[in-house]
């Protein structure tokens, strides 16, 4: 009886790895790996090329029954309404959006303290962000990078139709449709909340229902 094979794809900061495994036993059957470019920003097309190379090294995926993709967090891939990449992806290790992170916290903390809230406006802003989306903005987060684009590249910001993480983009390319993301990933990037009573943190981008690609 033919065994069932599944594949795992890890599109990390440094490389793409493809692992083909026996679904029943967990035995490693084949493996491939290809490097990604160094740096804090990258053209997503390199991720696709690396995936193709790694998949070829792993003997191809034609006999695989299922495939899952995971990878680096906190990157920003912005797409237009045709699904085209607007600019190089800003990775988690790009900290140029630190001023935007601070500004987002300051803005949400500006209103007077309510019952039980800290008197310090920065602490208050962080607390309100956590209440709204589960985390407080830092320079590595996707949201702050979007705010950076809005402030520094307004023409690119106007083109944004969807925002996704690096492995979301690769999942879309592999599946042939999308873009997609997990709710948990969007939540970690301060892009999503499942709370109907949460305050609406304002950024320099208009609020829209597809802020996180779905």
Specify the residue positions occupied by each region the protein language model found.
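Pocket-flanking alpha-helical
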Residues: 99-104, 122-125
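Structural signal for hydrophobic packing residues in well-ordered secondary-structure cores
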Residues: 24, 55, 59-62, 105-112, ...
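N-terminal glycine/serine-rich phosphate-binding loop of ATP-dependent small-molecule kinases
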Residues: 1-88, 99, 131, 159
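Intrinsically disordered, low-complexity terminal tails and inter-domain linkers enriched
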Residues: 109-124
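Glycine-rich phosphate-binding segment of PLP-dependent enzymes
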Residues: 102-109, 210-214
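Carbohydrate-associated surface elements
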Residues: 94
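Generic beta-strand or strand-like secondary-structure segments
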Residues: 50-53, 100-103, 148, 169
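Gly/Ser/Thr-rich active-site cleft segment
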Residues: 11-13, 115, 129-214
